[in-house]
Each structure stands twice: as structure tokens, then as C-alpha cells.
Regions:
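ABC-family P-loop ATPase nucleotide-binding domain
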Residues: 1-30
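ABC family nucleotide-binding domain
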Residues: 19-22, 26-202
Length: 202
């Protein structure tokens, strides 16, 4: 049985020095339903270089969120090439994918989740502490300040508005300093001014 920590080290070593990029080549994804096989992604090709920010637009149900899941290794493509942070995800098993995401990818889902029994500060800091980051509280405070929530550190999710909760989720992703950040409608619950500030951060 493989050692997850050793695998994580090997993955990190193989990724280091590469262009922290996204590369999709002729990606297809089909799912089986009661109605038969449904094609979700058809021949998607996309290249994103390190330092670039790319927005994907399209109609509801067009596959945007699914493509993000494929890039993060949360969905397996039926065919094609999927490289994230310079690493071919098709060669990783599920345990290796989990380690890979932890070390390289930050995700803000459209339907994000905060732990209701933790404060805003704890929701950002605790995942960092689990990852062994020693300055987790300071980093969490800095990111919450960056999204305009420095006055809400001790508030629980139930005490925050929907937009404030979304900013906590964004701060949590920013604080991890991932090589690649994937965000699904990250400003959907924010007003124009706050949304613009968040886009500047991105």
C-alpha cells in the first residue's frame, strides 16, 4: 500500500518548477442517466498560463461548473487530456488526487459551505492549521481583512448575511495561497462595489 505522505511529496516535487497552468485537450465527459448517456462536455480545449485569469461564460446548464470539477480532479473526464498545475490528472488515483488538490488547488463552489459552529476567523484558519501552516490565524485575519470582514471575525455564519458568508468562503480559498484558484460565480451574492473589490483581489 502506498504512503500518502510520500505520494504528496512526490507530487509536489514533480509539480515544482513547472508552469502552474491548466491544459485541457479535446476533453469529453459523458454521464449515464435514466434517459441514457448524456454528453456534458464535448471536445473542450483550454490553455491557461501561470498568472492568467480566465472567465468562462455561458448559459445555465452549459457545463461550466462541470468543467471546473474536471480541472480540479473532482470529476473524471471520459476522454482527453487534463493537466492542472502541470500534472496529468489521468495518472492519479483518488488518494493522490485528494493530496494534489490539498497542495495545489483552491476552490470556491457556487454552493459553498461554512461550518456553523465556527466563527468566520475559525472557518478560514482551521483548514490552514490542518495543513500544518503555522501562521494560520494571522493569515486568516489578513485575508478576511482583504475581503472587508475585519469587523466580523468573531461572528458565526448564522450571524452573517449571504454576501458576507460568500466573502468568508473566498477568504478561505485566498488564505491557502493555491497555485490555481477555481471559483464558480464567486461574486454571485455580492453587491457591485464589493464584487468589484473581490475581482481586484482575484
Amino acid at each position: 500500500m502506498s504512503d500518502p505522505q510520500q505520494n504528496s511529496k512526490q507530487i509536489s516535487e514533480q509539480v515544482s518548477g513547472r508552469g502552474k497552468s491548466i491544459n485541457l485537450q479535446d476533453v469529453h465527459l459523458s454521464l449515464t442517466s435514466d434517459a441514457g448517456e448524456v454528453n456534458i462536455l464535448r471536445g473542450i480545449s483550454l490553455g491557461v498560463e501561470s498568472g492568467e485569469a480566465v472567465g468562462v461564460i455561458g448559459p445555465s446548464g452549459g457545463g461550466k461548473s462541470t468543467m471546473m470539477m474536471v480541472i480540479a480532479g473532482l470529476e473524471r473526464a471520459s476522454s482527453g487530456t487534463v493537466e492542472t498545475a502541470g500534472f496529468d490528472l489521468t495518472n492519479l488515483n483518488e488518494d493522490e488526487l485528494a493530496l494534489f488538490r490539498r497542495d495545489n488547488v483552491g476552490i470556491v463552489f457556487q454552493d459553498f459551505h461554512l461550518i456553523p459552529t465556527m466563527t468566520a476567523l475559525e472557518n478560514v484558519a482551521v483548514p490552514l492549521e490542518f495543513a500544518g501552516i503555522t501562521d494560520a490565524p494571522e493569515r486568516a485575519r489578513d485575508r478576511l481583512d482583504a475581503v472587508g470582514l475585519d469587523h466580523r471575525l468573531a461572528h458565526y455564519p448564522g450571524q452573517l448575511s449571504g454576501g458576507e458568508q460568500q466573502r468568508v468562503a473566498l477568504a478561505r480559498a485566498f488564505a491557502a495561497r493555491p497555485a490555481i484558484l477555481l471559483a464558480d460565480e464567486p461574486t454571485g451574492n455580492l453587491d457591485g462595489k464589493t464584487g468589484g473589490a473581490v475581482m481586484d483581489l482575484l
